[in-house]
């Protein structure tokens, strides 16, 4: 399996009495891994799944074109200005970037295939008798991820259909309403979306300062900046994923520094896409209202980012399915988590002191939106209960629902869950998008 392979590639170190896995602190560049759960993620004894909504992020990818340009400029500058390389950084003298911008890596392809296979195995009782309805936003690597996921989904099915179910692609076009891709909330796109970067700055300056000093001592003449340091850290996961061996970039940084770097990204995400931003959760309201419609088998009621042409047509938005799977990118997933009220009890994250994931209710970027991230919204019928129950898992971690009287398994009745979605049902501040 992809996860086991990467762990073997990366190896382990220790911090305190616990094993430290570097790849669990790569933020959005982390490969998928099952996140620790205080509640057993297995389907509860005596319960039968009657509905599942999956939301998936694409697998591991190469750097995007803009980031690749920045990496190339940094490496070219280093190789021109540095003549004396220490042993630990000697590899930089001949290092060559071998990336294919924006494309999935071979590891990411396997990761996504495994995601589909895992989904089928978990929901086999439902999947063997019900076709999934699958949608995606229209970005190349995301669309490719759907095909890989479907291959994994059907891989272990004894009675395979003659053809895989089609994929409904929602165009990533400016001005085109799309619940799987942000872009239509003007105030967010032009202002609020950048607040995470501002919130990140104090911590970024604090944790990178000693690292930058150390690297400049190792690379005399490099004159590295904070941004350069972060880019060198990012080249660790990027090179590891494409080469299938642990990158030498990874060994330039300590376990504490990896945790600090992860927290920096967590701050940026929290203050852009989640509760730290007045319009962050708003970007997930449209999908949340679609989810309510699917759970209740009632028409969509929404005046935000839904596309009424699509949601009004049973061919593009059926209400009679038991398995729905949507593919998107990490930021949209995070906005959806927040619109759903997940992690709602997280206190505002400190901009100057690192808050560990366990103290932040699990709010850590690599726990939320790693490559091949997945959210499952399950509806189930449990013995002795008249009404169906709803619960949510994010990367194998049960996220206890809030505001609906959740039981010890983190579940709420369907009726109370829908009632608790007041933020989304009332428009989620969408009116502020155009002030």
Predicted segments, located by residue:
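Signature for phosphate-centric chemistry
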Residues: 15-133, 137-324, 328-435
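Fungal secretory targeting signals
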Residues: 1-19
């Amino acid at each position: 399996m992809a996860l086991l392979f990467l762990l073997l590639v990366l190896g382990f170190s220790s911090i305190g009495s616990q094993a430290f896995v570097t790849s669990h602190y790569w933020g959005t560049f982390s490969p998928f891994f099952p996140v620790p759960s205080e509640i057993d993620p297995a389907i509860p004894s005596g319960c039968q799944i009657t509905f599942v909504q999956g939301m998936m992020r694409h697998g591991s990818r190469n750097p995007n074109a803009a980031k690749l340009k920045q990496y190339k400029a940094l490496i070219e500058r280093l190789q021109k200005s540095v003549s004396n390389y220490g042993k630990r950084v000697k590899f930089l003298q001949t290092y060559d970037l071998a990336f294919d911008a924006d494309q999935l890596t071979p590891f990411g392809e396997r990761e996504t295939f495994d995601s589909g296979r895992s989904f089928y195995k978990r929901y086999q009782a439902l999947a063997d008798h019900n076709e999934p309805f699958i949608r995606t936003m229209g970005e190349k690597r995301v669309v490719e991820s759907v095909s890989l996921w479907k291959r994994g989904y059907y891989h272990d099915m004894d009675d395979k259909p003659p053809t895989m179910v089609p994929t409904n692609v929602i165009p990533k076009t400016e001005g085109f309403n799309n619940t799987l891709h942000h872009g239509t909330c003007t105030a967010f796109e032009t202002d609020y979306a950048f607040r995470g970067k501002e919130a990140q700055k104090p911590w970024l300056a604090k944790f990178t300062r000693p690292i930058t000093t150390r690297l400049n001592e190792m690379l005399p003449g490099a004159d590295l900046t904070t941004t350069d340091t972060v880019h060198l850290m990012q080249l660790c996961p990027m090179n590891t994923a494409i080469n299938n061996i642990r990158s030498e970039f990874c060994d330039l940084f300590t376990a504490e520094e990896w945790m600090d770097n992860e927290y920096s990204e967590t701050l940026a995400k929290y203050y852009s896409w989640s509760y730290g931003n007045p319009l962050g959760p708003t970007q997930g309201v449209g999908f949340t209202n679609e989810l309510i419609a699917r759970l209740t088998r009632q028409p969509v009621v929404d005046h935000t980012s839904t596309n009424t042409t699509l949601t009004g047509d049973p061919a593009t938005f059926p209400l009679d399915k038991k398995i729905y799977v949507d593919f998107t990118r990490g930021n949209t997933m995070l906005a959806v988590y927040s619109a759903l009220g997940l992690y709602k009890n997280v206190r505002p994250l400190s901009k100057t002191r690192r808050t560990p994931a366990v103290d932040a209710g699990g709010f850590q970027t690599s726990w939320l939106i790693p490559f091949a991230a997945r959210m499952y919204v399950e509806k189930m019928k449990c013995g002795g209960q008249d009404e169906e129950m709803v619960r949510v898992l994010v990367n194998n971690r049960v996220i206890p629902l809030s505001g609906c009287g959740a039981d010890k398994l983190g579940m709420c009745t369907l009726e109370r869950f829908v009632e608790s979605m007041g933020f989304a049902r009332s428009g989620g501040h969408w009116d502020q998008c155009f002030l």
